[in-house]
């Protein structure tokens, strides 16, 4: 039987992971909007274009790293979650798969 502290820790981890996924998706959307705005720059010179592309590339790389970190954290704790918790009829594996699917759909857009 799990102690209340263990249950609280597991729930806290799940909420943190879901918050991190939402944060990552939000930042990916910001990058997408930023790309659309950058295309509308009027009469840009080569230096401006290179600077903006560099900024976008750096932001995109940071978001990819954040996504990979999230996947590692979730997979590292998969056994703990699978053994101890089910949320609204969904297993931990199903919750993680749903989160990965959302991120993949965001990448495709």
UniProtKB/Swiss-Prot annotation:
Keywords: Coiled coil, Host cell membrane, Host membrane, Hydrogen ion transport, Ion channel, Ion transport, Membrane, Phosphoprotein, Signal-anchor, Transmembrane, Transmembrane helix, Transport, Viral ion channel, Virion. The keyword Mitochondrion does not apply. Residues 58-83 form a coiled coil. InterPro entries: Flu_B_M2. It is found in: Virion membrane; Host cell membrane. Residues 28-109 are intravirion. GO terms for molecular function: channel activity. The gene is M. This is Matrix protein 2. One of its GO terms (biological process) is proton transmembrane transport. Forms presumably a highly low-pH gated proton-selective channel. Trp-23 may function as a minimalistic gate that opens and closes the pore. When the environmental pH is lower than a threshold, the BM2 channel would be activated and selectively transport protons across the membrane from the extracellular side to the cytoplasmic side. Crucial for the uncoating process. It is a single-pass type III membrane protein. Influenza B virus genome RNA segment 7 encodes the M1 (AC P13879) and BM2 proteins. Normal translation produces the M1 protein. The M1 termination codon overlaps the BM2 initiation codon in an overlapping stop-start pentanucleotide 5'-UAAUG-3'. Termination of M1 translation triggers reinitiation on the BM2 AUG in the +2 open reading frame.
